[in-house]
Swiss-Prot record:
Species, as recorded: Oryza sativa subsp. japonica (Rice)
Stated name of the protein: Solute carrier family 40 member 1
Short name of one Pfam family: FPN1
Domain of life the protein comes from: Eukaryota
Transmembrane spans: 58-78, 94-114, 123-143, 189-209, 212-232, 279-299, 308-328, 346-366, 377-397, 413-433, 442-462
Function, in words: May be involved in iron transport and iron homeostasis.
Length: 484
């Protein structure tokens, strides 16, 4: 393998470092396969549930609550498990559990789609059992996907880019996020095509078959990356020894009441570690952005449909929104090179805030021109994706750089748990404010939370840099303008 010093070349100018570039491509392909299966299921499960229980969003809402609750409650534990196990152990556990969960969910959904009506009429317990299997399998798939995300995005990427210029880590992060957003854009298109022109039952069976076949390819790709970068095995061994030492030290200490209480609450220690980090404010600010209806999710899509916007228009707007998000993965490296990670995040979050002003204006435009209001809402949300995903990349890199290696997995688990908690609150608010005519209230609430997130991040920037603007550069320019 080429030396690590050549790693920056393929990311920055496309030359040299052929072996490292090939290994990175394997990492990207493996990540693509994992995200593609997850995004297909994420899009399709709502359609499956509506078909199984026509005329009601009950099963869809219950599934969303179960999945979000599982990640919110168990996310810190997943992070702690990833931190304690060797990289290959986590890899095997992730891929095995994710593949088995998606296969089980696909099989149970297929059975519900084919036999659901008969089961509900003849044997309701069997119907409920299949729904429970689908929900539990989906929750397990989400937890295993979280483990894989922490392993690849929080650990492997940082280790691979270790000792390289900051632009290398920025480049890898951007490609990883670009893959995720591309899957978010294209996987629903393929799934929708399959459902519309073949059948929903066939799409569920194909989803199970895809995950069964893809898991072996993913394993081979990731193992080859692990073997190709010696730093990964070295870091894994160091982390494992540190975990063993911590266990031995804990066993040698007397079992005080406080330690027993901490054992009963395994998440508490993870949250305490998270709260001690220097980057806790950016992390909480990012989590606030998940408590929102200002995205092409279930609530906003349903409201647009209620307002009479055709489904194909909504899907095109969603595609434009995803394309803007993908563009953010190209813009962010350039912005990072000019203004640093911290300032790139500051400009990004306030750019998102400015775009969402159009969405707030749509609330007051709705009474006089409902169609124009809907277009303003879609346009504002789509434009805001540039700032949103640039901010996401900035916070992710701040955490990669600012969190100690020993805490990285735990912090990643808590961060995802916190984001899922706010995502869950969005579902709760949708239940409380369920009338589409009151959707404007949810828009204003979402905008308020984005404002809070921007304020928190601005406080962090001021705390670190001791200033927000270079007044020594701005004032001379103002004096020059006044003099002219």
């Amino acid at each position: 393998m080429a030396s690590d010093g050549h790693l920056a070349a393929p990311l920055l100018d496309g030359g040299g470092g052929v072996d490292d570039a090939a290994l990175l491509r394997r990492l990207y392909v493996g990540h693509f396969l994992a995200r593609w299966g997850a995004r297909m299921w994420e899009f399709s499960v709502g359609l499956y549930m509506i078909r199984i229980w026509p005329g009601s969003l009950l099963l869809t809402a219950v599934y969303g609550v179960v999945e979000a609750s599982a990640v919110a409650a168990l996310g810190p534990i997943v992070g702690a498990v990833v931190d304690r196990l060797a990289y290959l152990q986590v890899l095997r556990l992730w891929l095995l559990l994710q593949g088995a969960s998606f296969v089980a969910a696909g099989v149970s959904v297929t059975a519900l789609l084919v036999y659901g009506a008969r089961l509900a009429a003849a044997g309701f317990p069997a119907f409920v059992a299949l729904v429970v299997v689908t929900n539990v399998s989906g929750a397990l798939a989400a937890l295993s996907t979280l483990a894989g995300t922490i392993l690849i995005e929080r650990e492997w990427v940082v280790v691979i880019a270790g000792g390289q210029p900051a632009a290398v880590l920025t480049g890898i992060n951007s490609v990883i996020r670009r893959i995720d957003l591309s899957c978010k854009l294209l996987a629903p298109v393929l799934s929708g095509f399959f459902i519309s022109f073949v059948s929903m039952e066939a799409s569920a069976a194909a989803l199970a078959a895809w995950n069964l076949a893809a898991v072996w390819v993913q394993y081979w790709l990731f193992v080859s990356v692990y073997a190709g970068f010696p730093a990964l095995s070295e870091t894994s061994q160091i982390s494992r020894r540190r975990a063993d030492d911590d266990e031995a030290a804990a066993a040698a200490q007397p079992q005080k009441v406080e330690r027993l209480w901490m054992t009963m609450l395994p998440c508490w220690e993870s949250w305490a570690v998270y709260a001690r980090q220097e980057v806790v404010l950016p992390g909480v600010a990012l989590a606030f952005l998940y408590f929102t209806v200002l995205s092409f999710g279930t609530l906003m899509t349903a409201t647009l449909d209620w307002e009479g916007i055709p489904a194909y228009v909504i899907s095109l707007a969603r595609g434009v929104s995803a394309a803007v998000g993908i563009a953010a993965t190209w813009v962010y490296p350039a912005a990072h090179a000019r203004v640093s990670t911290l300032r790139a995040g500051l400009w990004s979050i306030w750019a998102q805030w400015c775009c969402l002003l159009v969405c707030v204006a749509s609330v007051w435009a709705g009474g006089a021109a409902p169609l124009a209001s809907a277009w303003m809402l879609m346009g504002g949300v789509a434009a805001s994706r540039l700032g949103l995903w640039m901010f996401d990349l900035a916070v992710m890199q701040l955490m990669q750089d600012g969190v100690p290696e020993s805490d990285r997995c735990v912090v990643g688990g808590v961060q995802n748990s916190l984001q899922s908690m706010f995502d869950l609150l969005t579902y709760v608010m949708g239940i409380i404010v369920s009338d589409p005519r009151d959707f404007g209230e949810l828009i204003v609430l979402s905008f308020f939370l984005v404002t809070c997130a921007a304020a928190m991040y601005t406080m962090h920037v001021y705390r670190v840099r001791k200033h927000l603007f270079h007044l020594d550069r701005i004032l001379p320019k103002m004096n020059w303008i006044k003099a002219s």
